Regions:
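Flexible glycine/proline-rich, aromatic-decorated loop/lid segments
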Residues: 112, 119-132, 172-182
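Alpha-helical transmembrane segments in multi-pass membrane proteins
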Residues: 23-24, 28, 32, 36, ...
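Helix-loop-helix hairpins and the membrane-proximal interhelical loops
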Residues: 1-34, 52
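Structural signal for the N-terminal portions of transmembrane helices
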Residues: 89-102, 126-161, 168-169
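Non-transmembrane accessory domains of multi-pass membrane transporters/channels
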Residues: 149, 156-206
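Membrane-interface helix termini and inter-helical loops of multi-pass transporters
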Residues: 3-17, 116-131
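Membrane-interfacial helix-loop connectors
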Residues: 20, 36-73, 82-88, 94, ...
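Membrane-spanning helices that line or support transport/gating and their immediate boundary helices
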Residues: 3, 48, 75, 79, ...
Length: 206
């Protein structure tokens, strides 16, 4: 088993980056995106990131930048997989990409304060030379939760605009493709006031 904390080559590589530089953050974000796309597994790269951070080799800021890249990389994979699917599948994949890219953009605008705030929630000092592996897991979990909750809290108010944007970018290949996935019987708000009719309309859709 390789002890990364005593691997001088690995230590020197990560030490060559300035963890306080946005150039470093963007570099690791891009690296996380590319590696996730190549590995086809954000979970595997997340495990590697946790090992690097918990061993003290990779600073938490750079580790979270990798995680942000993983969030984008995994959506690129789903978009490629959906290329041969129907219009609705491609739109769903693109909406996922749009959601994550938007979240990454606003996090980058206040990257260091945001990470410091998340670390303070779980009582971790991000400037410490070594972060306990158990505490690091809590930091990464807290970051993922805070990131997704905040991103959802913002974008939930812009679902109609997001839908229009996604439909504008991903156009149906033909009219029939659009009609095949449109609800014909369920629509409006009045039907929801009568559960019996709702069941009947749902049966018609099926």
């Amino acid at each position: 088993e390789m002890d990364l904390s005593h691997n001088q080559a690995v230590i020197d590589f990560f030490a060559s980056f300035d963890k306080e530089s946005y150039l470093t953050i963007f570099s690791f974000l891009g690296l996380g995106t590319i590696l996730t796309f190549c590995m086809q597994s954000s979970a595997a790269l997340m495990a590697i990131t946790m090992v690097l951070c918990s061993s003290g080799v990779l600073p938490i800021y750079m580790g979270i930048a990798l995680v942000l890249g993983e969030n984008i990389g995994t959506t690129i994979t789903s978009n490629i997989a959906a290329m041969g699917a129907n219009t609705q599948a491609r739109r769903a994949a693109f909406a996922h990409l749009t959601f994550n890219v938007f979240g990454v953009i606003w996090v980058l605008c206040g990257f260091y304060p945001f990470i410091d705030m998340v670390c303070s929630f779980v009582g971790v000092n991000p400037h410490a030379d070594h972060i306990d592996a158990a505490r690091l897991s809590v930091v990464l979990a807290a970051f993922h939760t805070t990131f997704n909750v905040c991103n959802t809290a913002v974008l939930i108010w812009f679902i109609p605009q997001m839908e229009r944007f996604v439909c504008y970018v991903i156009k149906p290949s033909n009219r029939k493709d659009e009609d095949d996935f449109r609800l014909r019987y369920i629509g409006g708000t009045s039907i929801m006031k009568t559960p019996e009719l709702s069941v009947l309309e749902a049966q018609k859709e099926i």
